[in-house]
Amino acid sequence: MVALRLIPCLDVANGRVVKGVNFVNLRDSGDPVELACRYSDEGADELVFLDIRASVENRNTLVNLVSRTAKSVKIPFTVGGGIDSVSSINDLLRAGADKVSLNSSAVINPDLISESSREFGNQCIVIAIDARRKVDKVGEWEVYVKGGRENTGIDVLSWAKKVEELGAGEILLTSMDGDGTQNGYDLHLTESVANIVDIPVIASGGAGSLEDIYDVFKEGRASAALLASLLHDKKLTLKEIKTFLLEKKLPIRPYE
């Protein structure tokens, strides 16, 4: 059985890690490379860096951050934010990133998914989907872009299936309703997407307790859990999380 993954997420703005609630009210959480090293040492399986301002300000994710991180950590990491061309992806992978995450650019130009998948292999291409529940519509979500500021009107489940067909290797699925709240993942959303695609789904948005993480694996059928606020705020450690999940008999890589 493939091991389930715990992935700290570092949202970056202006060169600093930030975290907010529902994509707003951002607060400083530290230096990205320092935090990356800390989480790597503490047993993270992978890392994700998301430049949350890049898409809004139409500028590329900093290759410098990738280069610094690649020299400092030994675990795989993904970088996303403002990546809108095959050449940008090439620059980031050459700088040391293992994967890239495409969000707004994939919606604007879906061909970028297939082009980049052919060029670099689908294992390098993660499609980030920022999902928000439709008002008064149970079981329906819409895709948001531009750092969660713009509603595309695209149905999340239809988009998830399409990106898989275009060559995505993974889906990074964020519940905008749960982001930063620490009230639990959106299990209905996560399971709904996991049930219709055959590629791994990384659940994001809402982790606040050991039980939340267990539930998103067991009930949500996620392949990986993204963790941010509860780690940055030192509410839980990766060792505590892994110990708990191993006691629950989930296939987690042991803390070393």
UniProtKB/Swiss-Prot annotation:
Active-site residues, record numbering mapped to chain: D11, D130
GO biological process, one term: L-histidine biosynthetic process
Cellular component annotations (GO), alphabetically ordered: cytoplasm
Pathway this chain belongs to: Amino-acid biosynthesis; L-histidine biosynthesis; L-histidine from 5-phospho-alpha-D-ribose 1-diphosphate: step 5/9
Signal peptide annotation: none
GO molecular function, one term: imidazoleglycerol-phosphate synthase activity
Domain of life: Bacteria
The EC number(s) this enzyme carries: 4.3.2.10
Keywords from the named record: Amino-acid biosynthesis, Cytoplasm, Histidine biosynthesis, Lyase
InterPro entries: Aldolase_TIM, His_biosynth, HisF, IGPS_HisA/HisF, RibuloseP-bd_barrel
Enzyme class: lyase
Subcellular location, record wording: Cytoplasm
Entry similarity comment: Belongs to the HisA/HisF family.
Protein's job: IGPS catalyzes the conversion of PRFAR and glutamine to IGP, AICAR and glutamate. The HisF subunit catalyzes the cyclization activity that produces IGP and AICAR from PRFAR using the ammonia provided by the HisH subunit.
Protein name: Imidazole glycerol phosphate synthase subunit HisF
Species, as recorded: Prochlorococcus marinus (strain MIT 9215)
